[in-house]
Amino acid sequence: MNPREIRRMMAQMGIKSTEMSDVKQVIFKGKDKDYIIDNASVTMIEAQGQKTFQVLGNLREVKKEVEQYSEDDIKLVMEQAKVTREKAIEALKAANGEPAQAILNLTS
């Protein structure tokens, strides 16, 4: 069977296939690690009201870092120093988890 016949048969069965050419990366968020597919080639297949995605690419796994600072400390540093969450966490790391020192480091 050639690809043209396959597409025609799929159309007769009500199956629609769409290449998602603008997708470059796919990330699946797991409990302990993330699965990242780079150089992704994604095809969406629609059949019987359901959408299924076929993903091809280069898989890499990234373990999640256990957050060691309380949400309250992070928010306090963010609000007082007027910085992003990432900057607040970096400042807390540099200040050994001490919010007051993190704020002083960011504002002075």
Swiss-Prot record:
Residues 1-68 form the NAC-A/B domain. SMART domains: NAC. InterPro entries: NAC-like_UBA (IPR044034), NAC_A/B_dom_sf (IPR038187), NAC_arc (IPR005231), Nas_poly-pep-assoc_cplx_dom (IPR002715), UBA-like_sf (IPR009060). SUPFAM superfamilies: UBA-like. GO terms for biological process: protein transport. PROSITE patterns: NAC_AB (PS51151). Pfam families: NAC, UBA_HYPK. The keyword DNA-binding does not apply. Disulfide bonds: none annotated. Keywords: Protein transport, RNA-binding, Transport. The keyword Transport applies. GO terms for molecular function: RNA binding. Homodimer. Interacts with the ribosome. Binds ribosomal RNA. Contacts the emerging nascent chain on the ribosome. NCBIfam families: archaeal-type nascent polypeptide-associated complex protein. Belongs to the NAC-alpha family. This is Nascent polypeptide-associated complex protein. It comes from Picrophilus torridus (strain ATCC 700027 / DSM 9790 / JCM 10055 / NBRC 100828 / KAW 2/3).
